[in-house]
Amino acid sequence: MRRGLLRLAPLVLAASCGPTEPSPSPAPTATPDPCATAPSAYAKAVLDSWIPACSLAQDIYNDPTKALGAPDAGGSGPNNFTGFVSLGFGGRVTLDLGGCIADVAGPDLRIFQAVGSEPVSVYVSLSPAGPFTLVEARKECGGAYSGIRRYCDVDIASGGATQARYVRVEDGELFPCPGGTVSEGADLDAVQALAVATVGLRDPGR
């Protein structure tokens, strides 16, 4: 009899404690909305950049932050230019507009280049991690603007994109380095979101 009572004890204890509740599952982490904020008229932050070592060894215009804000390239060459970053052989800079632009009829982005008319390739993405969509491949970027500044316009729909926040500009000249200059590759001055108003924003020299 005593042995039977001992066998019943665990069952009585379990019943008194009630059913075991499963541990609650952790709430999923919300994915940030890249389009929650309004875009700036000009790129406002550098996401990443890469310039090949053989170009860095002789280029003197290597600061990717020079591609931020309104176009402001100026000065005289070869050693006294200001306001741009030389991308070097196949180099690139990826910029953040601060919010999403949506495709509209006609061009959506204006790429400002300095001094020459070297071609550029342009990619866009909604995520800093990509994937990046090619929207222009090696487009000549030499439209006259002012002073030493040149430009070319890009329609993101050319690559099938409908929205974009991050813009990657890549050298399309592809002249092997070292090339014997201090400003190898395309010289990136600024990236503009054409549908965003620029009222009150200063564009030096325009």
Segments the model singles out, each with a brief description of its role:
Residues 14-16:
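C-terminal motif of bacterial Sec signal peptides marking the signal peptidase cleavage site
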Residues 23-31:
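Ser/Thr-rich, Proline-interspersed low-complexity disordered segments
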Residues 1-9:
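Bacterial N-terminal signal peptides that target proteins for export
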Residues 18-20:
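Bacterial signal peptide processing site
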Residues 202-206:
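Short, solvent-exposed mixed-charge patches
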Residues 30-200:
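A domain-level signal for the mature, folded cores of soluble proteins
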